[in-house]
Structure formats: structure tokens, C-alpha cells
Amino acid sequence: MSERQIHSVSMELAGRTLTLEAGRFAEQANGAVVVRYGDTMLLATAVASKEPRADADFFPLTVDYEEKMYAAGKIPGSFFKREGKPTDSAILTARLTDRPLRPLFPEGYRNEVQIIVTTFSIDMVNDPAPLAIIGASAALAISDIPFLGPVGAVQVGYIDGKVQINPEMPDMPNSDLDLVVAGTKDAVLMVEAGAKELPEDLMLEAIIQGHQVCKQICDLQNELVRLAGRPKREFVPPPVDTSLEEAIQQWLGNRLYEAITDPNKMVRDAQTEALKQEVIAHFTADEPEEELEARIAAVSTAFENLLYEEVRRMILERGERVDGRGPKDIRPISIEVGLIPRVHGSGLFTRGQTQVLTLATLGSPAEEQRLDDLGIETTKRYIHHYNFPPFSTGEVRRLGSPRRRDIGHGALAERSLLAVLPSKEEFPYTMRLVSETLSSNGSSSMASVCGSSLALMDAGVPIKAPVAGVAMGLITGKDGRWRVLTDIQGIEDHLGDMDFKVAGTAKGVTGLQLDIKTTGITYEIMREAFAQAREGRLYILDKMNAVISEPRKELSPYAPRIITLQINPEKIGALIGPGGKTVRGITEATGAQIDIEEDGRVYISTPDAAAAQQAVAMVEALTREIKVGDIFLGKVVRIMPFGAFVNLAPGKDGMVHVSELDVGRVENVEDVIKMGDEINVMVIGIEPGTGKVSLSRRALLTGETAEDRRAAGAGRGLRDGGGRSGGSDRGGDRGPRGDDRQRPRRR
């Protein structure tokens, strides 16, 4: 057996060392590379089937990102103590890795390719997401799989007014930008970003700076290819029967143009499909039975190619789109809010034949989503879920758990609203939004952004500004011509070269997603796309503002009311009680949900205003800082010969000495009060250290102050700190000691 050859290359990146290593792990994979950056370490593998998939009319690429809990020194929390289905975070990282790689495989390549990225070590400093892209690209680059890469990737932040490459994870909460850019040495391929209302020129500058570093990372991968690369498999693209296309084009004449130029998607699709079947019938009529299936496939492919060319020719040569719009035109928009009863907020956004209904639900802080993945355990108080049922495109499909696309679209819309949400101090609610795609003809994710903004305002959430989103497309020609399209629909997304989604306020960008279907786009195209996107976004915002321009002043009557209290953190234990008994008792008595933060913030949530006030009173009574001079209405809970104990708050009693019960001399405590009586008392002393409380009923009867009673009772031990046993039991006008206290007799 030959000795294993291990090859490694490194570069300095943002003050840390980025290392790529091949040859140590997974030797049976077509390509395997370990990426290390700081102490974050990933293994990326690439494997391709030996033969193309016969039934595939698409490129069968699968990318999986495997989060292993050992990478963060954790044991999985499930019953089986084993990793289960991928988390949303893992799915989003897999999609992020897939998107820049997919355009770089040869046209017509149909071999199955599987990329698996496995986390070996996570240091909580260096984000693994861009490293997954680098590792996957490097594994493909050194393999024998046909690939037009490599691809570099970096994270870009904007902190203290400066663009920063690969900021450390603890610094990201202070960043106004969280952007991942990926590209080859020649062009940008993918961008994913969330931002705090940043201007378009700054976003473009961040992309450009990030891409410059991507070029260096591509050089590093090429160096590894020189050391460890394998010869590429020979791949010959399937031949294109141009004579068949020409024959179909001549037979069709102008009929294809007439079929696809209808503003209604359903009519257009029906006409196009009918024409396609007519073409197939005509050009397979004389085909022998044994060759019929292959001939049908060839005619179908030729027709689709003609459709592709016709749509693109219309746009490039005449600026004409299939629904009659110009390149910058936006489809008709319809907006409604408050449609659905009992939900806390709703917004219906319709743009052309894309329609999304977004519904908002407000909950207590206890309903925040807990995230326990490879990162630090955190919670999420704003949650957005996107649903794409089959009826939205007139299809029949089995319903099941959310698909990767659904999770990705939901995350994009969620990220696009984060910049305008109120802080927890301003608005302590947990917010869950669900976008139901009711009809789809392109750009449903951006319709979800618009619907989310509408639903939040309808729910009375005090967002800083409305947010809208628009999807931009691109058509490029072989002669270098190109056109950017505003508000693309399904056919333009399918047949175009770019899907560039931009969300934001009137002030700036809050969300961004760029996917390219060619080998990249130039900075000039991106600059034009940003400009057109801003123009389109402002137009949509005007339409939205005409219906609802600011949050409603009142919450829905069906939404819980949350009251925030601030207590001394030292009182948290008293509020919770042993095993949570006390706080559960408040919930059982009032029906209110009580949530307690470590800093002493207490959230009381319930739709019932009276119950809320009752819960507030109980919490305040439990956590009230008792001070000398305070007056309480308390219940007598114990009577002794020397006085009575009065309950001031749950778990907190004080003692009224017999001399403080009444104005005159009291021989018997029960001559004045009985067990269960409620009496008004004043705090006249608190014993340091123990916190025992001395009370006086007499002070309230005579109009004296606590200071007066302490001065009068100096001889009885009522010093500044109060007397023993939580109250005074000495001196004054008491009777003999035997009347005051019963002592056990010694035997």
C-alpha cells in the first residue's frame, strides 16, 4: 500500500490563518478537503456517480451540511443522544453552499453529485458558513468531477462605519451588515445579506471588497489543485440537433410568439402546452415505435430551447416581456389588511398572479423559540414561516414537512424585517408570522416580505418603518447585451440568468439575496440592478402606505396584554418560590403567564385586564422592598402572648408587639385582634441582617410616625434596627415577663 500523501496550503485572512488540506481523510471520495480557520474545522467531500442519471432532465446535485454536536463539545439532547434531522441553520448553510456551485457544472452534465460538509470543530469565533462553500469548492476542484470553479467565499460586516472581512462571531451583534459573498476569480456568483437599512452604494462596496478577497481564496484552491488535483473526467455535452430546431421554428412561424404573449399565466401556459403537443404530434407522426420515446424527448427539448430563445430575444431586442410589460414595470398590486377575524394581524399582498397572505400572532416572552445548535444557546423572538402549498401553482403534490426552499424563503423574509423590529424593552412580545402562498407566479418570497410588514402594522407592532421587497431578473445575450428586469415572474425566473431579491425601507436595504445561473455577473450589472430595485421598492412602498402607513395604536382584543415590571434581582427567588411553587400559584390564581428574566424584568401576559392587574398586585406584594414607614393592610396569621404576626406579602410576615396594638394598655392580644383579622399596620423597624420587621397598629391610630414610635419604644429595644424576634418584646408598659412569654420548664 502506497504511503498517503498529505498536501496543505495556507494564507492569512483577516488576521487568522486559513488552511486547506487534502489527503488525510476520506480517500475513497472523489475529492475531500479539510478547511481550518482558527479552531473551526470542516471536512468537505465530493462524490459523483460513474454514469449519468437516465431519467434526469436537470442536474442532480445534492448538498448536505452535517452539524455534529461533538464539534462544540456537546452531547445531543434527544432521547437517543444522537443527531437527528438537520436544523434550520444546517439547511440554510447547505443552500448557501449549493447556490454558487450549481452554475459551475457543465451544461448537460447529468451525473449525480453529492457534496457533504461535516463539522469537526466549531470555535464560536469563526463562522463556518463561508468555510463550507470554500471546502465544497476545493473538494470539487481537486476531484475528477467536471467543475468550472474554484469558488471563494467570505463574510462581510459593517462595524463602526467600516467594512470588515470575516468579523469574529462575537462582534456580529454590533455589525450593521451580515453579508456572505461568493464568486470565482472573474465574477460574483452569490450574495446573501441582512442589513440595517444601509444604502445601495454601501452594499455594493461591501460586495466588491468581499469579492476581491474571494479571488485570493480561489488562488489558494488552485495551489492545492496543483499539489493534489486529479485529472478531470472527460465529458462531452449531448449533441444539439439544430436542424430539428430549425425545422420546428420554420413550421411554427409566429405561433410561438402569439402563444406566450398573454398577461395571464394560466392562459399562457395552456396555449404554450397545447402548441407543444401539436409540435410533438407533427414531428413524431412517422416515427417507428421503437424510436418514438427518444424522438418525443428530442422534439420536446427542441421546443423548450426555442421557447427559451424567444423569451430572451423579445426582451433583448425589443424590451418586451411576455405579459406586455417593459423592463422596469411592476405588475398590478392589490393590498388588504385586517381580513381575518381573531388573528392578531393580517396582510394580503397580491402582485400580478402572486398572492401571499401573512398572519401575525403575538405571544408572551415564554414562547420565544429556543435555539440549541452548535452555537451558543439563544432564543428568537421574531419567527417567520413560509408555506408553499401545491394549489398555489395549480399542482397536485403530497403535503409534508417544510421543504428546503420553504425554509430558505422564510429565513429571507425573516431577515428582511429584523432591522425595523422594536427592541424587547419597547415591545416584549414574541412575534410569529406565517406567510401562506395562495398563488405563485414568481417572487413569492418578496411578497412575503411585503405581507409581513402589513401584518405587523395591522397587529399594532411598532416597527420603525414599512418594508417592501422586489425580485430583479437578468437576460444576457451572446453579443454582450443585457437587460435588468424589475419584478420578475415565473417564466422570467426560469429562463433568465439572475434572481436578485432586494428588500428594504425607504431609507435603505434590509435584506438581499443574489443567485446567478451563468458563470457570474459584473459590478456594472449589480449597480444597475440595485438602482432599479430601489425604484421598484419605493413604488411598492407607496402602494402599501396608501392602505396602512404606520402601526395601529391598539393591539387586537384577542392578543395578550403584557405588563413589564422591574424587581430587585435578589427577589427573583422569592417570586419563583421553592420548585416554582409561588409563581405557579400566581398563574393558577389569575390565569396570567409570568416570565422572569435574570436582570429582574418580569413579564405578565394575559388577554384579561383584570387578571393582569391582579397578577401585578401579587408580584409587587411578593417583591416589594419593605421600608420603614410603609403602611400595609395585613392579615393576622399567628397570635402569641407578646404580640401578633401579620402577613404583609406572600412569604413575608412582620410582628406587632402587644404594646403597639392599641393606644392604651393591652393585657390580652385577643382583646384587640383575632386570628384572620385584616388590620392596617405601619413598619416601624427592620432588623439588619435578618430583615425581621417590627410593626405598629398604634401609630396609625395616634397619627404618629415610625420615628415617633421608635423614639417612644427606645427602652423596649426598638432601636433603629428594630427589636429581637422581628419586633419589640422589652420594657415599656408590658406586664410581667411570665405574661409576655411562656418558657418551657426544665426538668
Swiss-Prot record:
Domain spans labelled S1 motif: 629-698
Query: What EC identifiers does the entry list?
Result: 2.7.7.8
The UniProt GO MF terms for this protein read: 3'-5'-RNA exonuclease activity; magnesium ion binding; polyribonucleotide nucleotidyltransferase activity; RNA binding
One GO cellular component, as annotated: cytosol
* KH domain sequence ranges: 560-619
Query: What segment(s) does the record annotate as region Disordered?
Result: 705-747
Q: Where is the composition biased (Basic and acidic residues)?
A: 706-722, 730-747
- Short name of one Pfam family for this protein? RNase_PH_C
Q: Which cofactor does it need?
A: Mg(2+)
Task of the protein: Involved in mRNA degradation. Catalyzes the phosphorolysis of single-stranded polyribonucleotides processively in the 3'- to 5'-direction.
Please report the name of this protein according to its UniProt entry.
Answer: Polyribonucleotide nucleotidyltransferase
State the organism named in the record. Roseiflexus sp. (strain RS-1)
Per UniProt, what is the name of the gene that codes for the protein in this document?
pnp
